[in-house]
Amino acid sequence: MTKITIVKCPQCGTNVEWGEQSPHRPFCSKKCQMIDFGEWADEENAIPGAPDMSDSDGWSEEQY
């Protein structure tokens, strides 16, 4: 017997069955997925930790 895994949509809290029948998992819908993406793009969400202020990417804000 296969155990069905149910997770809560991180955006609205709706129960979502974790499997191929839920293409937007862990979200319940494309709408919730896009709302979450927008929050990350607007920097409303962030991964905790100190910001990396090094210039290791080779880019600089100085004009030449």
From Swiss-Prot:
Cofactor: Zn(2+)
InterPro entries recorded: DNA_gyrase_inhibitor_YacG, Znf_NHR/GATA
GO biological process annotation, one example: regulation of DNA-templated transcription
Cofactor note: Binds 1 zinc ion.
UniProt entry keywords in alphabetical sequence: Metal-binding, Zinc
Biased composition (Acidic residues): 54-64
KW Zinc (keyword) present: yes
Domain of life: Bacteria
Disulfide bonds: none
Record-linked Gene3D superfamilies: Erythroid Transcription Factor GATA-1, subunit A
Gene Ontology molecular function terms on file: DNA topoisomerase type II (double strand cut, ATP-hydrolyzing) inhibitor activity; zinc ion binding
Region entry Disordered, spans: 42-64
Pfam assignment, any one: YacG
NCBIfam families: PRK00418.1
Self-association and partners: Interacts with GyrB.
Family statement drawn from the similarity comment of this UniProt entry: Belongs to the DNA gyrase inhibitor YacG family.
Entry protein name: DNA gyrase inhibitor YacG
Organism: Vibrio vulnificus (strain CMCP6)
Phylogenetic placement of the source organism: Bacteria, Pseudomonadati, Pseudomonadota, Gammaproteobacteria, Vibrionales
Gene this protein is translated from: yacG
